[in-house]
């Protein structure tokens, strides 16, 4: 248990599990210099579970600031990356009494971006599984899926998002 500040992004190699004690007793946030970076970049056969990710922002110029993305050139040999029992809590940079989560800022950290175009050509699939995950992402997209990626979304929720789930048919990508 505890609160941890880490330099984002955290790269999770193939077959590795990042496991907290429980989502309410382990909180992960970025260092001040990495607040607008992605939190986790996942390879295939990896897992992140039992923690809360918070206090990061979205950088629209670099399309960074997601809790979860595929690692560049990722591969899935046996199973997709798996995210379980995780809460993502973000807010915009400008908050007020009438907008306590910064919905109007439009720069709160986002939940996940799944882009099948960055999969390695020999990857079995370009998918990610979410189970019992909550994205509190005010004024921004909670989950975006594009370019042939797949998502399993089991018992998950988005709150305060401008778009809870956005699925875009891209022009590139594995199995797209």
What residue spans do the PLM features occupy?
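Short, intrinsically disordered, charge-balanced linker/junction segments flanking boundaries
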Residues: 1-5, 67, 173-176
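All-beta strand scaffolds that present successive hydrophobic residues in beta-strands
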Residues: 17-21, 47-53, 78-85, 100, ...
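N-terminal accessory/assembly segment that mediates macromolecular interactions
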Residues: 1-2, 154-156
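N-terminal extracellular ligand-recognition/capping segment immediately after the signal peptide
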Residues: 1-17, 21-36, 52-57
């Amino acid at each position: 248990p505890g609160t941890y500040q880490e330099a984002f992004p955290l790269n999770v190699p193939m077959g590795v599990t990042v496991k907290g004690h429980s989502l309410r007793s382990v909180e992960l946030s970025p260092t001040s210099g990495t607040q607008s970076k992605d939190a986790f970049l996942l390879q295939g056969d990896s897992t992140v579970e039992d923690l809360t990710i918070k206090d990061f922002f979205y950088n629209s110029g670099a399309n960074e600031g997601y809790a979860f993305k595929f690692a560049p050139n990722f591969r899935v040999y046996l199973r997709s990356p798996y995210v379980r029992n995780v809460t993502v809590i973000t807010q915009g940079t400008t908050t007020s009494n009438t907008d306590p989560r910064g919905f109007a800022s439009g720069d709160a950290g986002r939940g996940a971006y799944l882009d099948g175009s960055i999969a390695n050509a020999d990857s079995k699939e370009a998918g990610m599984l979410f189970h019992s995950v909550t994205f509190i992402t005010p004024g921004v997209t909670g989950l975006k899926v594009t370019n042939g990626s797949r998502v399993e979304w089991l018992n998950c929720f988005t709150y305060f998002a401008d778009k809870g789930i956005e699925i875009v048919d891209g022009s590139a990508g594995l199995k797209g």
